[in-house]
Amino acid sequence: MDERLGELVTERRSPDSAELDRMGTGELVRLMAREEARVPEAVARQAPRMAAAIDAVVERLRAGGRLIYVGAGTAGRVGVLDAVECGPTFGVPPGRVVGVIAGGREAMFDPRESAEDSAEAGASDLDRLCVGPEDAVVGVSASGRTPYTLGAVRRARERGALTVGLSCNPGSRLSDIVDHPLEVVVGPEVLAGSTRLKAGSAQKLVLNMISTISMVRLGKTYGNLMVDVRASNAKLRDRARRIVELATGAPPEEAAAALDRCGGEAKVAIVALLLGVGPDEARRRLAAGSVRAALGEGRRP
């Protein structure tokens, strides 16, 4: 065990929760709510670094590369959670946004705590994905020292990929080996060392921002509407129709009919209705992927 582990911010004992087991339930709720409220502030302090990292990720995605999250334990699960949501939300094809967790798929539901200790396993998992210069790899580790994550990120660098490191400690090992270090320091946890709490919340918030903002930049939205939504169930089909209504001002029946003509693709239906063209012409105009570009509109600089 690393003798310096106890010196990490994420391992320290918070004086505010030193009497945790003696507090009443209401007091505990208020304490945890106060602590969680620190998370957005810590994330906001990294805004300039995050913007630079996201712009670099977008370059890789625009060139056909992948966004790959890698981590162990909570950090790995948060990455998988964000990755799997990108398909239905933004219509990205399988394998474009990937979550890799130490211990494999089983570790999502059954803890494989020892899996994080192998840097070789991290490197091997990246090799299996055939990571290359066109990809962006985001290593996630609250401590910034998890061997599995460090091994994966080092291998990603060796293979020429863009690397981003997300940790919750200042001056972490992870920060030292990536192109874009993000250090979201949220302070000691209410339950000392339990980084599934504030650190986990911070990781989820940052990954939400990386994926969502990247998709916005790639034209996967029109305004704040998810126009590339994959209408794969009743709820999402209804949402797609409402999106077409909101974007075009068309009544429900007209929006539904346009969606049917356009194979359920909200983006195509919007362009077809607004420009008065058929589905094929709408798809041609959407070749660059952006509704605004298809309509001849620009975005703010």
Curated annotation (Swiss-Prot):
GO cellular component terms, A-Z: cytosol
Protein's UniProt keywords contain Lyase: yes
Keywords for the protein's UniProt record, in alphabetical order: Carbohydrate metabolism, Lyase
UniProt GO molecular function: carbohydrate binding; carbon-oxygen lyase activity; enzyme binding; enzyme inhibitor activity; fructose-6-phosphate binding
One Pfam family matching this protein: GKRP_SIS_N
CDD domains: SIS_Etherase (cd05007)
Enzyme class: lyase
EC number(s) from the headed UniProt entry: 4.2.1.126
Additional note from the record: A lyase-type mechanism (elimination/hydration) is suggested for the cleavage of the lactyl ether bond of MurNAc 6-phosphate, with the formation of an alpha,beta-unsaturated aldehyde intermediate with (E)-stereochemistry, followed by the syn addition of water to give product.
NCBIfam families: N-acetylmuramic acid 6-phosphate etherase, PRK05441.1, PRK12570.1
Quaternary structure, from the entry: Homodimer.
Family from the record: Belongs to the GCKR-like family. MurNAc-6-P etherase subfamily.
Protein name: N-acetylmuramic acid 6-phosphate etherase
